[in-house]
Amino acid sequence: MNGTEGPNFYVPFSNKTGVVRSPFEYPQYYLAEPWQFSMLAAYMFLLIVLGFPINFLTLYVTVQHKKLRTPLNYILLNLAVADLFMVFGGFTTTLYTSLHGYFVFGPTGCNLEGFFATLGGEIALWSLVVLAIERYVVVCKPMSNFRFGENHAIMGVGLTWVMALACAAPPLVGWSRYIPEGMQCSCGIDYYTLKPEVNNESFVIYMFVVHFTIPMIVIFFCYGQLVFTVKEAAAQQQESATTQKAEKEVTRMVIIMVIAFLICWVPYASVAFYIFTHQGFNFGPIFMTLPAFFAKAAAIYNPVIYIMMNKQFRTCMITTLCCGKNPLGDDEVSASASKTETSQVAPA
């Protein structure tokens, strides 16, 4: 066995020399050098310093400016809330534990940290699914003159939470479990063992199929259809140049969000799947820690992408930060750019 399993942990280090200790009780400096734990703490501090202000600002600016409260923005705000869950429920905890070299909050704290980190990641994934469906319904028009309105956005937000809880809650009630991972300073789903006592194998399969593969299939299908429809509409000049530009800007923004999500989460999911399907494989703590670095960066990129690619939101943010004045003098964007969900790009 290339790892050491305890009642509520799995340390990726053989205990032949007898040095392995519970990650809830002793520093894990036999897994990595102390300076590496310090680097992990510094990275968590950076994510907190960047992640909290930018996501909080996203929420605050939307509350301050009524024009931003569009159905599409409800989903984007949901992403900001998910990111804040990751900041407060995950990053702050990992910062503190990495400074101590082990998970000082015990199994209960591990459950809470793992729950919030998983919840935030799943809300983000399912929010991207809802955004993909919204873009598909609005642009491709599979249901004639359907309009994506406030009630649909609220139902979409509700769906993201239901599906996220369906993934994050089971380990708390006996289906799988949360355990320290990587350098043992943060917690996640147990990908390392089969653990029949908690039916871990069935849960991991369920999670990869329902909460990763299916969402990815939906997203790629929607955007495949969307790209084809937009190209056909542009070729036939079925819409005004202004409407086409507005649709393309929103669609481009959402597609970039999906690409960023894949860059952040696919390495983590791939490594987790590899570990799970290669039980007994000899891997070190850094093998899982590095992909987790990419995954945790997800709390920053969504609001950055939105601010950079949405002129109306960017203008409102600058106005809010500058006490009601915009020193850049940007003109207000047209209604078509802020309410693209009602446009009429016809299907090919």
From Swiss-Prot:
Region (Interaction with SAG): 330-348
Modified residues (Phosphothreonine): T340, T342
Binding site for Zn(2+): E201, Q279
GO molecular function per UniProt: 11-cis retinal binding; G protein-coupled photoreceptor activity; metal ion binding
Annotated Pfam families: 7tm_1, Rhodopsin_N
Membrane topology recorded in Swiss-Prot or TrEMBL: Multi-pass membrane protein
Residue stretches spanning the membrane: 37-61, 74-96, 111-133, 153-173, 203-224, 253-274, 287-308
Record keywords, A-Z: Acetylation, Cell projection, Chromophore, Disulfide bond, G-protein coupled receptor, Glycoprotein, Lipoprotein, Membrane, Metal-binding, Palmitate, Phosphoprotein, Photoreceptor protein, Receptor, Retinal protein, Sensory transduction, Transducer, Transmembrane, Transmembrane helix, Vision, Zinc
'Ionic lock' involved in activated form stabilization (motif): residue ranges: 134-136
One of the GO BP terms on file: G protein-coupled opsin signaling pathway
Glycosylation sites: N2, N15
Residue(s) carrying Phosphoserine: S334, S338, S343
Lipid attachment residues per UniProt (S-palmitoyl cysteine): C322, C323
Residue spans, topological domain Extracellular: 1-36, 97-110, 174-202, 275-286
Modified residues (N-acetylmethionine): M1
Subcellular location: Membrane; Cell projection, Cilium, Photoreceptor outer segment
Disulfide bond annotation, renumbered to this chain: C110-C187
Function: Photoreceptor required for image-forming vision at low light intensity. Required for photoreceptor cell viability after birth. Light-induced isomerization of 11-cis to all-trans retinal triggers a conformational change that activates signaling via G-proteins. Subsequent receptor phosphorylation mediates displacement of the bound G-protein alpha subunit by the arrestin SAG and terminates signaling.
Family, as annotated: Belongs to the G-protein coupled receptor 1 family. Opsin subfamily.
Subunit structure of this chain's protein: Homodimer. Interacts (phosphorylated form) with SAG. Interacts with GNAT1. Interacts with GNAT3. SAG and G-proteins compete for a common binding site. Interacts with GRK1. Interacts with PRCD; the interaction promotes PRCD stability. Forms a complex with ASAP1 and ARF4. Forms a complex with ASAP1, RAB11A, Rabin8/RAB3IP, ARF4 and RAB11FIP3; the complex regulates Golgi-to-cilia rhodopsin/RHO transport in photoreceptors.
Name of the protein: Rhodopsin
